[in-house]
C-alpha cells in the first residue's frame, strides 16, 4: 500500500480495526493521527513514515490489511507530550484518538474517537507552551470592493490558553506589520481562489503555520452570530465591533476551528477587545527587528529590551511585558498611570516594601493558563492544587497593597481585583489533596473527608496489611503450623503458603492454589472473600475518584471569570513591580509628557548596551518644532547607531509606562517610530540590499507624520557615490519639507552637513574621536556641529586589514582629496580607474615587481646573524647590499 489514499480506496478489504482507523483518518486529512492501542499511540501508513522521519522513530511493518503490509510507528502514551512538542514546533497538527470503550466488553475493535486535535495555534498543555510568550491562533478574512479588489483584511486572533480574543481591520499593505506585532503560531485562511484571479490575495508568509479551511467558514453573517453566541450577547455594539464585518467573518472561522480542535465549548472566551491602529504607536516589522525588543538580530532571546526588563516573578507578568512592548499606547495617560504606580511601589513603606511584594509574588502559580485548562476540562490535579494555593496566598498579598492604594489608582484597582472567589477556595480546599498525584489515574487526588464512599473504599484497600497479619496469627494458632505465611502477589493474588513438611496439618477448608518445589500455596473461603473485596475496592476507588474529579471540574466552571480577573490583576502587579525593581537597580527616572511635539533627553543611555559594558557614555538628544532633524556624522564604531537606537528605545519605554535610563526625559506625542538601520539581501524575495533599503525608505517617506520619530542610518549605500549622495540629500530634504517628522539622520556624506544652511530646522551633531598615532580612540560623546572626518582607514586597521592595503588606501585617499579640491572628476564606471592610481600605487597586488626586489633584500638580511659577523664580513656584506640596491629592479 503506497499511500494513505490507496489504503482508503476500498475500506471493506481491511480488517475491522484498520477500517476503524481509516474512517477516523478520513475525518482528519492532513493531520497526523495518534491512534491509541494499549500503552502506545500508533501511526499507520503515510503517517507512520512521516512521523518516523520527523521524530526519529523506528518504522516497522506488522501484519497486513487489504493485502498490503501495514507500516507502523509508535510512541509511548506516558511520553506523548514530548513528541507532540516536537511536531507542533515543526508546524504539524496531531489528532489524539483515544480508546473510549471497555476492551473487556467490546465485541470487535474497542470504540475509539478523536478527543482533541493539537495544532500550533491551539495549545493549552503546559508541556507544549512557552512559559514567557503567548501562543496565538489567527484568522484572516479579505474584504473586496465592487470590482473584486481587496480593500480591507479582517483579523481575529485568540490566545486559547487564556481566552483572550481580539479583532482588527487593516489595509492589505498593513497586514505584515500586524502579523509581526501579533506573531501568530497558526494562521487560518480560506481555500485559495484560482491563481489566475488577478484580485487574489494571500497572507504574507513567514509568520506561522498556515491552515486552509473552507471558504464558507468565513461567512460574515454566520461569523457575527457565532461571535454573539460565544460572548452571550445580542449584538456587538458594546464591543465596538458591529461595523467590522471582515473581522467578524474571521472570528467566526476562528471560533469554529478552535472549538473543533478541543472537541467542546470555549467556556473561557467571554470577552472581546477591538484593536485600532490609532490606539498604539506604530512599529513596522523593520523597527521591531532593529530595536531588538524581544529578539536580537541574530534571532536569540537575549540581550534584548525584554530580557533586560523581565525580572517578573510570574510567567504571567513576563507574557504581559511582551504584550506591552509590542503595544505601546499613544495616549500618554496610560503611561502616566503606570509610572504613578511604579513611583508608589518605590516609595512604599517597610510593611509594603517592594522586596516583600516580590517575595509574595514568587509564590503565585500561572493561574491564567490553569484557568484556560479548567475551562476546557483538561486541568490536571496539580493545576487545581496550584490554583488553591495561589488563592490562599492572596490575602497576604492584598494586605501588602493596602498602604499603596491611595498613592496610585491602578494599585487600588488591582487590590480590588485580587479578591479571591470564596466559594471556589472553599471547594478546592475541601476537595483536593494537599499534594495530589500528577494524574487522576494514579489516585490520591481527592482529599479525605470529601466523599464518604471514597473514604470507605480507600480504608478497605489500605487496611489489607493489618487483616493479613491478623489472619496469619489466627491460622497459625488453628493449624499448629508455626511457619505459615499469608502473602500476596499480582499473578496469584492472596494465598497461604505452607512448607512441604507441614502439609499434613492443612485443614480441609484449604484449597490448593499453586504448587512450588518446597511449598504449597492455598486459598480459604475467608481469604477469597477478602480478596474479592480488597481488589475490587482499589479498582472501584480509582473509578470513584475519577468520577468525583470530573464532577469537580464541572463545579469549578462558574468561577472561570473570577479566576481570569485575579490572573489579569496578578500579571499587571507583577509587571509594575518588575518595572519598579529595574528603575531602582539601574537608576532610571520617570519621564514627563507634554502636548508640544518633541523629544528632550538629558544624559540618556542605551538600556541594553549599558548593561553589557563597564562604562557607558550618556548623551543628550533634543528634537523640537525648531529642531526637527539631526544630521549625525562621525566615525564608524563611534556610536551613531547606538545613539539613534537609544533615543527610540527611551521613547518607547516611556510610552510603555516604564521609567527610562536618563537624568531627565520629556516627550511630546508620538504616533509611529520608523527605523532604516542596516540591511541585508532578501534572497527569497529576490531583492538586493539596496532595494530593501529603498523599500523601507519609501515606506517612511509615504507614511511619516509630524508626530513620527524616524531613524535613518547611512541611507544611500549600495549604489554609486553620487547616486547615493543625491538620494540621501533628497530624502533628508523631503523629511524636513514635507513630512516634518522628528528625524535622526546618520550619514558619512559630509556634503549633507550643509543642509542646515538651507533648512534652519536641521542641525548637525557628531560623535567625537581622537587620533593616537595611526590609531583612534572613540569617545562616544555627541557634540554639536559636523565631524571633520570619518576615520574609516583607522577603523579598517583596527579590524585587521593588512598594512599594505591600508597604505594603498591612504595614498588613494590623498589622490581623491586632491581631485575633489580641484576640478570635479567624472563619475567612473565599475571597471575604470584613474591612471594616477596605477602609476603611484605601492600596493603589492598592483606593483609585483617592486615586491620582488624588496623581497630579495629582506631575504638576504634575514639570513644574516649579526652575532657571527667579523668586522671584515660586515664590510663585505655592506658592499653586497649596496650592489643589490643598485640593481635595475630595486625601488627608486
UniProtKB/Swiss-Prot annotation:
Pfam families for this protein: MutS_I, MutS_II, MutS_III, MutS_IV, MutS_V
SMART domains the record matches: MUTSac (SM00534), MUTSd (SM00533)
Keyword annotations from UniProtKB, A to Z: ATP-binding, DNA damage, DNA repair, DNA-binding, Nucleotide-binding
The family this protein is said to belong to: Belongs to the DNA mismatch repair MutS family.
Keyword GTP-binding: no
Domain of life: Bacteria
Residues that hold ATP according to the record: 634-641
Protein name (Swiss-Prot/TrEMBL): DNA mismatch repair protein MutS
Gene Ontology CC terms, in alphabetical order: cytosol
GO MF assignments: ATP binding; ATP-dependent DNA damage sensor activity; damaged DNA binding; mismatched DNA binding
Annotated function: This protein is involved in the repair of mismatches in DNA. It is possible that it carries out the mismatch recognition step. This protein has a weak ATPase activity.
One record GO biological process: mismatch repair
Amino acid at each position: 500500500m503506497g499511500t494513505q489514499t490507496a489504503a482508503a480506496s476500498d475500506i471493506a478489504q481491511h480488517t475491522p480495526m484498520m477500517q476503524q482507523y481509516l474512517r477516523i483518518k478520513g475525518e482528519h486529512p492532513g493531520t497526523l493521527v495518534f491512534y491509541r492501542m494499549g500503552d502506545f499511540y500508533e501511526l499507520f501508513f503515510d503517517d507512520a513514515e512521516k512521523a518516523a522521519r520527523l521524530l526519529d522513530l523506528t518504522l516497522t511493518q506488522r501484519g497486513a490489511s487489504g493485502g498490503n503490509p501495514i507500516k507502523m510507528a509508535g510512541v509511548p502514551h506516558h511520553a506523548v507530550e514530548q513528541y507532540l512538542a516536537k511536531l507542533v514546533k515543526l508546524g504539524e497538527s496531531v489528532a489524539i484518538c483515544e480508546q473510549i470503550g471497555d476492551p473487556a466488553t467490546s465485541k470487535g475493535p474497542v470504540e475509539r474517537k478523536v478527543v482533541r486535535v493539537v495544532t500550533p495555534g491551539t495549545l493549552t498543555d503546559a508541556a507544549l507552551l512557552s512559559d514567557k510568550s503567548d501562543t496565538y491562533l489567527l484568522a484572516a478574512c479579505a474584504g473586496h470592493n465592487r470590482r473584486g479588489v481587496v480593500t480591507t483584511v479582517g483579523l481575529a486572533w485568540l490566545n486559547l490558553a487564556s481566552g483572550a480574543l481580539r479583532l482588527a481591520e487593516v489595509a492589505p499593505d498593513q497586514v505584515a506589520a500586524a502579523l509581526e506585532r501579533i506573531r501568530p503560531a497558526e494562521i487560518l485562511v480560506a481555500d485559495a481562489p484560482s491563481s489566475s484571479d488577478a484580485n487574489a490575495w494571500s497572507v504574507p508568509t513567514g509568520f506561522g503555520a498556515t491552515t486552509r479551511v473552507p471558504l464558507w467558514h468565513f461567512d460574515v453573517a454566520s461569523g457575527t452570530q457565532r461571535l454573539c453566541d460565544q460572548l452571550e450577547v445580542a449584538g456587538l455594539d458594546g464591543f465596538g465591533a458591529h461595523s467590522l464585518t471582515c473581522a467578524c467573518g474571521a472570528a467566526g472561522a476562528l471560533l469554529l476551528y478552535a472549538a473543533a480542535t478541543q472537541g467542546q465549548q470555549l467556556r473561557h472566551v467571554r470577552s472581546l477587545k477591538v484593536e485600532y491602529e490609532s490606539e498604539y504607536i506604530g512599529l513596522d516589522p523593520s523597527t521591531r527587528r532593529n530595536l531588538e525588543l524581544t529578539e536580537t538580530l541574530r534571532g536569540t532571546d537575549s540581550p534584548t529590551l525584554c530580557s533586560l526588563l523581565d525580572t517578573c516573578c510570574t510567567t504571567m507578568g513576563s507574557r504581559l511585558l511582551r504584550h506591552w512592548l509590542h503595544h505601546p499606547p499613544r495616549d500618554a495617560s496610560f503611561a502616566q498611570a503606570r509610572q504613578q504606580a511604579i513611583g508608589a511601589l518605590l516609595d512604599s513603606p517597610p510593611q509594603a516594601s517592594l522586596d516583600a511584594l516580590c517575595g509574595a509574588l514568587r509564590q503565585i502559580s500561572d493561574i491564567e493558563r490553569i484557568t484556560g485548562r479548567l475551562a476546557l476540562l483538561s486541568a490536571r490535579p496539580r493545576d487545581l492544587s496550584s490554583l488553591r494555593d495561589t488563592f490562599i496566598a492572596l490575602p497576604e498579598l492584598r494586605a501588602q497593597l493596602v498602604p499603596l492604594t491611595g498613592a496610585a489608582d491602578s494599585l487600588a484597582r488591582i487590590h480590588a481585583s485580587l479578591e479571591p472567589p470564596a466559594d471556589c477556595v472553599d471547594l478546592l480546599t475541601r476537595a483536593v489533596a494537599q499534594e495530589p498525584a500528577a494524574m487522576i489515574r494514579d489516585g490520591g487526588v481527592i482529599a479525605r473527608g470529601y466523599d464518604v464512599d471514597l473514604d470507605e473504599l480507600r480504608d478497605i484497600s489500605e487496611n489489607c496489611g493489618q487483616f493479613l497479619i491478623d489472619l496469619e496469627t489466627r491460622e497459625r494458632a488453628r493449624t499448629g503450623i508455626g511457619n505459615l505465611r499469608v502473602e500476596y502477589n499480582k499473578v496469584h493474588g492472596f494465598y497461604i503458603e505452607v512448607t512441604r513438611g507441614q502439609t499434613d496439618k492443612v485443614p480441609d477448608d484449604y484449597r490448593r492454589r499453586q504448587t512450588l518445589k518446597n511449598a504449597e500455596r492455598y486459598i480459604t473461603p475467608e481469604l477469597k472473600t477478602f480478596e474479592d473485596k480488597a481488589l475490587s475496592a482499589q479498582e472501584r476507588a480509582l473509578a470513584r475518584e475519577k468520577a468525583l474529579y470530573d464532577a469537580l471540574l464541572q463545579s469549578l466552571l462558574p468561577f472561570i471569570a473570577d479566576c481570569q480577573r485575579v490572573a489579569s490583576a496578578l500579571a499587571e502587579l507583577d509587571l509594575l513591580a518588575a518595572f519598579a525593581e529595574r528603575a531602582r537597580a539601574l537608576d532610571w527616572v520617570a519621564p514627563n509628557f507634554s502636548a508640544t511635539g518633541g523629544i528632550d533627553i538629558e544624559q540618556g543611555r542605551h538600556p541594553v548596551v549599558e548593561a553589557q559594558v563597564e562604562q557607558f557614555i550618556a548623551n543628550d538628544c533634543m528634537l523640537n518644532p525648531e529642531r526637527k532633524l539631526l544630521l549625525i556624522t562621525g566615525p564608524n564604531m563611534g556610536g551613531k547607531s547606538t545613539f539613534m537606537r537609544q533615543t527610540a528605545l527611551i521613547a518607547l519605554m516611556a510610552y510603555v509606562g516604564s521609567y527610562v535610563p536618563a537624568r531627565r526625559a520629556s516627550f511630546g506625542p508620538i504616533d509611529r517610530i520608523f527605523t532604516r538601520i542596516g540591511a541585508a539581501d532578501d534572497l527569497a524575495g529576490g531583492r538586493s540590499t539596496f532595494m530593501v533599503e529603498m523599500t523601507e525608505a519609501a515606506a517612511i517617506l509615504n507614511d511619516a507624520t509630524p508626530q513620527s520619530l524616524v531613524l535613518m542610518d547611512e541611507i544611500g549605500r549600495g549604489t554609486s557615490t553620487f547616486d547615493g549622495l543625491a538620494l540621501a540629500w533628497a530624502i533628508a530634504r523631503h523629511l524636513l519639507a514635507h513630512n516634518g517628522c522628528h528625524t535622526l539622520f546618520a550619514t558619512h556624506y559630509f556634503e549633507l552637513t550643509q543642509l542646515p544652511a538651507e533648512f534652519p530646522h536641521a542641525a548637525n551633531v557628531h560623535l567625537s574621536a581622537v587620533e593616537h598615532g595611526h590609531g583612534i580612540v572613540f569617545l562616544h560623546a555627541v557634540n554639536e556641529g559636523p565631524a571633520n572626518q570619518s576615520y574609516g582607514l583607522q577603523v579598517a586597521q583596527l579590524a585587521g586589514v593588512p598594512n599594505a592595503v591600508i597604505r594603498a588606501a591612504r595614498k588613494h585617499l590623498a589622490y581623491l582629496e586632491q581631485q575633489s579640491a580641484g576640478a570635479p572628476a567624472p563619475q567612473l564606471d565599475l571597471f575604470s580607474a584613474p591612471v594616477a592610481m596605477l602609476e603611484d600605487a605601492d600596493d603589492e597586488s598592483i606593483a609585483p615587481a617592486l615586491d620582488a626586489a624588496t623581497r630579495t633584500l629582506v631575504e638576504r638580511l634575514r639570513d644574516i646573524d649579526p652575532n657571527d659577523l667579523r668586522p671584515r664580513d660586515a664590510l663585505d656584506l655592506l658592499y653586497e647590499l649596496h650592489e643589490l640596491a643598485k640593481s635595475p629592479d630595486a625601488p627608486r
